[in-house]
Amino acid sequence: GTGRAGEAAARSFVSIELGLDIAQCNFRTREGEIDIIAKSGVEYIFFEVKTRTNKKFGSGVEQISARKALRLQTTGQRYLEQIGAENADWRIDLLSVEMDKTGRVQKVTHVENAIEEQS
């Protein structure tokens, strides 16, 4: 589906545009899943990939809800524990992939620390 094409586009964006090393894709635990985990120097970046096919859903770049962010955080923590890097710095970024109706990727938008502020 569009999700898969979106994730492929997101992966090449991370390695080519951002020039980062991808450590793992689709890392899953009981708590959740992280689409892409990359490393930037000593910092780990947990990427959430959102794919959408049309502009109707608001063209402003979305944020990650606080609840979802918490799941990503817990999942990310698990990943760091597994690789023996639980004290590493990390952040959660968003990759928003926009596609046209034929499923071609139009644009990838990268938002650092894309978590909604809790009111």
Q: How does the language model describe each region?
A:
Residues 1-24:
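Acidic-basic catalytic patches of nuclease active cores, encompassing PD-(D/E)XK
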Residues 36-57, 72:
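Conserved catalytic cores of phosphodiester-cleaving nucleases, focusing on short active-site segments
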Residues 57-88:
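Mid-chain, well-packed structural core segment of small domains
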Residues 14, 72, 92:
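Residue-level signal for inorganic ion chemistry
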Residues 27, 49-51, 113:
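Active-site donor-binding loop signature of nucleotide-sugar glycosyltransferases
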